[in-house]
Amino acid sequence: MDTQVKLAVVVKVMGRTGSRGQVTQVRVKFLDDQNRLIMRNVKGPVCEGDILTLLESEREARRLR
């Protein structure tokens, strides 16, 4: 398992998900690897340009329907 913390910047806010809309789905770009974009679910306030600290960088969220 990847124990190193990765930093990623929010490129685009895709939408809200969860049973009550408490989770925001975002597309992030890693600061150390500029070519890699993944989708993540974020709990709490988030906007474009925010830097996230990811404890697990391999997990990707399913797309919104």
Swiss-Prot record:
InterPro entries: NA-bd_OB-fold, Ribosomal_eS28, Ribosomal_eS28_CS. CDD domains: S1_S28E. The keyword Ribosomal protein applies. Pfam families: Ribosomal_S28e (PF01200). One of its GO terms (biological process) is translation. It comes from the Eukaryota. It is found in: Cytoplasm. Signal peptide: none annotated. One of its GO terms (molecular function) is structural constituent of ribosome. Keywords: Cytoplasm, Ribonucleoprotein, Ribosomal protein. One of its GO terms (cellular component) is cytosolic small ribosomal subunit. Belongs to the eukaryotic ribosomal protein eS28 family. HAMAP family: Ribosomal_eS28. This is Small ribosomal subunit protein eS28.
